[in-house]
Amino acid sequence: MKKSYRVKKEKEFQQVFNKKQSCANRRFVVYVLEKPQQAHFRVGISVGKKIGNAVTRNAVKRKIRASLFQLKDRISPEIDFIVIARPGLEKLSSEEVKANLTHVLNLAKILDVREGIE
């Protein structure tokens, strides 16, 4: 996923957090900020130290990014959102990560339902 699709700066993260619009399941918390007239969505990924060491956290981030890449055509373009991984995610396969991420994105109404379920 291109860097233009990422929320990178702390100020941008804080804007999304301060909106306080969130959804969660057992594996993820997602914070959402609507940004009308934005060309494409932007995502920030946060994986805390409770998940494991740096190698484990980076592996989890790669799984999340890969899942988002597969879902990118279904994600609404006019939003910024932050995906926060919860402990236990490091034990899941890529398919399970994608299923959990799809579930929480549907709860947050980020995914376009017209495309159907993959």
Curated annotation (Swiss-Prot):
Pfam assignment, any one: Ribonuclease_P
Disulfide bond annotation, renumbered to this chain: none
PROSITE patterns per record: RIBONUCLEASE_P
E.C. designation(s): 3.1.26.5
InterPro entries from the UniProt entry: Ribosomal_Su5_D2-typ_SF, Ribsml_uS5_D2-typ_fold_subgr, RNase_P, RNase_P_CS
GO BP annotations, alphabetical order: tRNA 5'-leader removal
Catalyzed reactions per annotation: Endonucleolytic cleavage of RNA, removing 5'-extranucleotides from tRNA precursor
Record GO terms (molecular function): 3'-tRNA processing endoribonuclease activity; ribonuclease P activity; tRNA binding
Alphabetical keyword list: Endonuclease, Hydrolase, Nuclease, RNA-binding, tRNA processing
Gene Ontology CC terms: ribonuclease P complex
Annotated NCBIfam families: rnpA
Role this protein plays: RNaseP catalyzes the removal of the 5'-leader sequence from pre-tRNA to produce the mature 5'-terminus. It can also cleave other RNA substrates such as 4.5S RNA. The protein component plays an auxiliary but essential role in vivo by binding to the 5'-leader sequence and broadening the substrate specificity of the ribozyme.
HAMAP family: RNase_P
Protein family membership: Belongs to the RnpA family.
Assembly behavior: Consists of a catalytic RNA component (M1 or rnpB) and a protein subunit.
Protein's recorded name: Ribonuclease P protein component
Organism of origin: Enterococcus faecalis (strain ATCC 700802 / V583)
